[in-house]
Swiss-Prot record:
GO terms for molecular function: ion channel inhibitor activity; toxin activity. InterPro entries: Huwentoxin-1. Expressed by the venom gland. Keywords: Disulfide bond, Ion channel impairing toxin, Knottin, Secreted, Toxin. The presence of a 'disulfide through disulfide knot' structurally defines this protein as a knottin. This is Hainantoxin F1-31.97.
Amino acid sequence: ECKWYLGTCSKDGDCCKHLQCHSNYE
């Protein structure tokens, strides 16, 4: 699951591919 630790990113989003998400990736 691609989910932000302190965000509202979901696995359906492309945020997992963003470096910002990787930093807050749970």
